[in-house]
Amino acid sequence: MSHEAHNGTKLFKVQFTPDEEVLEHITDKQGVTPQSNTAAQRIVAVKNIIKNDDLHVDEATPESWREQNYVDVLGVDTEDTLQNGPGTGGGDVYSFYTIKRSNKMAQLATEMARTPAKTVSFSVSDNPEEAVSPPANKQTENKTPSKGRKNEFISTTPHRLRKRLSAPSQPSDSESDYSASNSDEELEEKSSAAKTPSKVSQTPGKTPSKKGKKNTASNLVEEYFEAHSSSKVLTSDRTLQRLQTPKLDQETLRKLLDQTPSAFADELHRISKKHEALFYKWMLQLHLGFNIILFGLGSKQSLIEKFRTSLLQDSLHIVINEFFPSITAKSILNSITEEALGHPGAFRSPLDQMDFILQRFKDDPSLELYLLIHNLDSQMLRGEKCQQVLGQLASIPNLHLLASVDHINAPLMWDQSKQSLYNWLWYETTTFGSYIEETSYENSLLVKRSGALALSSLTHVLRSLTPNARGIFRLLAEYQMANKDNPSYTGLSFQDFYQQCREAFLVNSDLTLRAQLTEFRDHKLIRTKKGMDGVEYLLIPLDLGTLTDFLEMEDKDT
């Protein structure tokens, strides 16, 4: 700072002075003790503290102290403002300038690179209290940081510059535990590299097992969705038609079954003898006014047949095979009136026929009849009316009923009133026998027969329909039976059939007829096809014998 005189006026010239020149004016260059205890001595003390690397003090804090003390020194005993001219203090003017330190960062980095023995700690964790501090010596370990200060040195040097400066000295830095780097990625790589070998050595086999479990679970999930996918499933073409052996007839199949040796023959024979020992007991209970019903696993036809041949040879008896598809309650009544009572006449209704039977047994107390029924729970006799008729027959004192059931829900056919009419005694007669006769009328893929139970199904379906619907089906069946000898018969056209139904007053429009035909088609009772001329033809897919039995049954019921 200097001043010049010009025209009798003093002018002050302010010039920026670096720190080195200021120190030369305050202290001697040879490091001699300061001459006076002034503010400049405080600057020297602060400078010495900054150059001490053992304290690890942040760079910004001492620099701010030096700036403040330096300004105080320049502004001593100056109280005038800048407008007063000669009395302007240096502190007021100096505060408007930004202090520039040329090459200060490079010098600091050079000093750090030249002192590799000194360790510098870095802040790695978020919590300052858990920062890493390498054990350089006991003196640094025992030091307790004062409040408001940090022992950690957070470097502000650019990462690239520090990397260039520290690269040549890495091979020789054997005493240093940590490198002067503040990169979080490098520290994470070092920590992971140090931890990985111990983990691998402790549990070498865990990782493959976990991967195997994940792969297995993923495979199971994929297989589940593949199995339940909505893709089209192809049906196998391996059918019975591809077999070289043709379908067998009923007699051939029965002969083959008879030639097959039965398993557990001795055990089955002992069971049969056990049941045969009850024959006289059953005979006594029948005469006491009870009726016998047999249940259990296996066919009981042979057991009832043995009872008939051993005890009923000299008695009047009727055997009814209810597994036959065309059996009805009316056919049972006809067998009693015609074969047992010898009455060839016809009756107007089943009620009149039932009254005749009751009156005949009432008039002749010496008349006794044994009624043996196989499969009382068959499909043809499960209806309400059939069970009511059989219950009234079982209630006759001189008519004795012995029946068998095979369905597990057979007792549900009878309510309390029917139970009182039957007056059952239940016997468990498990025979483990084959249902050969009972299933002989079932549809089989191995026998050359078609629709043995067609009549039974047809009867059940038509019973649930209206009288007009039954009349419509009857017209179609009669027309088909009338053309049974015509080899070129393809069916009855819809228009001709509609005209016949309209003349019989069964329908009043073609929509009503089509609605009824749709119901027949759903039950597979009829089949429709179009001819070459586009006309729709109707046909019943049943054999002539079944249609004949159906028409005879309808004639008897009416």
From Swiss-Prot:
<keyword id="KW-0539">Nucleus</keyword>
<dbReference type="GO" id="GO:0003682">
    <property type="term" value="F:chromatin binding"/>
</dbReference>
<dbReference type="GO" id="GO:0006260">
    <property type="term" value="P:DNA replication"/>
</dbReference>
<dbReference type="GO" id="GO:0003688">
    <property type="term" value="F:DNA replication origin binding"/>
</dbReference>
<keyword id="KW-0235">DNA replication</keyword>
<comment type="subunit">
    <text>ORC is composed of six subunits.</text>
</comment>
<feature type="compositionally biased region" description="Low complexity">
    <location>
        <begin position="169"/>
        <end position="182"/>
    </location>
</feature>
<dbReference type="InterPro" id="IPR056772">
    <property type="entry name" value="RecA-like_ORC2"/>
</dbReference>
<dbReference type="Pfam" id="PF04084">
    <property type="entry name" value="RecA-like_ORC2"/>
</dbReference>
<comment type="similarity">
    <text>Belongs to the ORC2 family.</text>
</comment>
<dbReference type="InterPro" id="IPR007220">
    <property type="entry name" value="ORC2"/>
</dbReference>
<dbReference type="InterPro" id="IPR056773">
    <property type="entry name" value="WHD_ORC2"/>
</dbReference>
<feature type="compositionally biased region" description="Polar residues">
    <location>
        <begin position="136"/>
        <end position="145"/>
    </location>
</feature>
<feature type="region of interest" description="Disordered">
    <location>
        <begin position="119"/>
        <end position="216"/>
    </location>
</feature>
<comment type="function">
    <text>Component of the origin recognition complex (ORC) that binds origins of replication. DNA-binding is ATP-dependent, however specific DNA sequences that define origins of replication have not been identified so far. ORC is required to assemble the pre-replication complex necessary to initiate DNA replication.</text>
</comment>
<feature type="compositionally biased region" description="Polar residues">
    <location>
        <begin position="193"/>
        <end position="202"/>
    </location>
</feature>
<dbReference type="Pfam" id="PF24882">
    <property type="entry name" value="WHD_ORC2"/>
</dbReference>
<dbReference type="GO" id="GO:0005664">
    <property type="term" value="C:nuclear origin of replication recognition complex"/>
</dbReference>
<protein>
    <recommendedName>
        <fullName>Origin recognition complex subunit 2</fullName>
    </recommendedName>
</protein>
